Amino acid sequence: MIQFKNVTKAYDNGIHALQNVNLKVEKGEFLFIVGASGAGKSTVIKLLLKEIEPTQGDVIVDGVNLSHLKRREVPHYRRKLGVVFQDFRLLEDKTIYENVAFAMEITEVPRAEIQRRVPEVLNMVGLGRKADDYPGQLSGGEQQRAALARALVNRPTLLIADEPTGNLDPETADEIMRILVTVNRRGTTVLMATHAKDIVNSMEKRVVTFQNGRIVSDKWKGEYFDEVKNME
């Protein structure tokens, strides 16, 4: 599903955000990527979203080498991805239904399919009764669930979650994780970047640890905090 082959990313200021990274993620896998700020997690996500290009090496997603994508092909590629950020990024002047529907409208999905699929995904994340509310009327946890619904409504093959529990209380964070696990069990590949050691250590998932742009650990379960210090 995802392959990084000898990937290096160096910026103009001389900083090497990634150094010779090799990583393979199988289809249907749930993967945590962890590390201190500046370790390379955000660069991995930006490369997957094709916001930046590698200085060296290949990034391959679902058999497609992203460096070979033409500019006009990038929007079509991104439609196959679901992305959830820490800061929700909901449109404040649209209802929750409209926020989720918008993700389908920009891909020109027929209205009948939108009307069928949006309520379905809102019910899945527990927001069926909040469809007509605006983001400002929702709690932080509800807003994150709305953002998750928006990311899932186009049925992505890969879901990228960048610190999705970062601003949430523990109980709400657990709710978000249960949804992510459910989505993964249905076949979606999930890649989650996080600092939440309690969440990582409570789940029997693969954990890849970055430090100074390199992978320093790749294993199952989240004992990485015993190996890499100062992760916050």
Tell me what each language-model feature is.
Residues 57-65, 77:
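Conserved ABC transporter NBD signature motif
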Residues 159-162:
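Catalytic Walker B motif of ABC-type/P-loop ATPase nucleotide-binding domains
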